[in-house]
A protein has these predicted regions:
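Glycine-rich ThDP/TPP pyrophosphate-binding loop and its adjacent helix/strand module
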Residues: 1-142
């Protein structure tokens, strides 16, 4: 849309690795590279967990970085829990002129909360007041 309207802005899109099971994502990836959308940055929350199961029990999406590069994207990988790395990676976009950028942020779902960490069971679970308080306590928050 920006190119057609001759507007100069940068678009950021965030997806989870579980979403990348959908073919429309890969169609969009091919089109973005084909049209040289250097004003597009994709952030992938790569936590290895989809809504219904761990990614490896479904259709594997790894190796993500290699796939995005094969589609013509400039790629960086970071620790998605390191705020400094996140800021540095976002400040550096576009990674290559004339190519869309993919930032793969490796994370652990529910990090720091024992009953939610690294499990799909808390992907869309109900958070009661008690659960909320327990999570805050485990994170060391008041």
């Amino acid at each position: 849309g920006a190119r057609i309207r001759r507007q100069d802005f940068h678009t950021f899109v965030m997806v989870g690795d579980g979403e990348l099971h959908e073919g429309s994502n890969w169609e969009a990836a091919m089109a973005a590279a084909h049209y040289g959308l250097g004003n597009l940055t994709l952030i992938v929350d790569s936590n290895r967990i989809a809504q219904s199961a761990p990614i490896d029990q479904l259709v594997r999406v790894e190796p993500l970085a290699d796939k995005w590069r094969a589609f013509g994207w400039a790629v960086r990988e970071i620790d998605g829990h390191d705020m400094g790395a996140i800021v540095d990676a976002l400040d550096a976009v576009p990674y290559e002129s004339g190519r869309p950028s993919a930032l793969i942020a490796h994370t652990v779902k529910g990090k720091g909360v024992s009953f939610a960490e690294d499990t799909y069971l808390w992907h869309s679970n109900n958070v009661t007041d008690d659960v909320y308080e327990r999570a805050l306590a485990e994170l060391g928050e008041p």
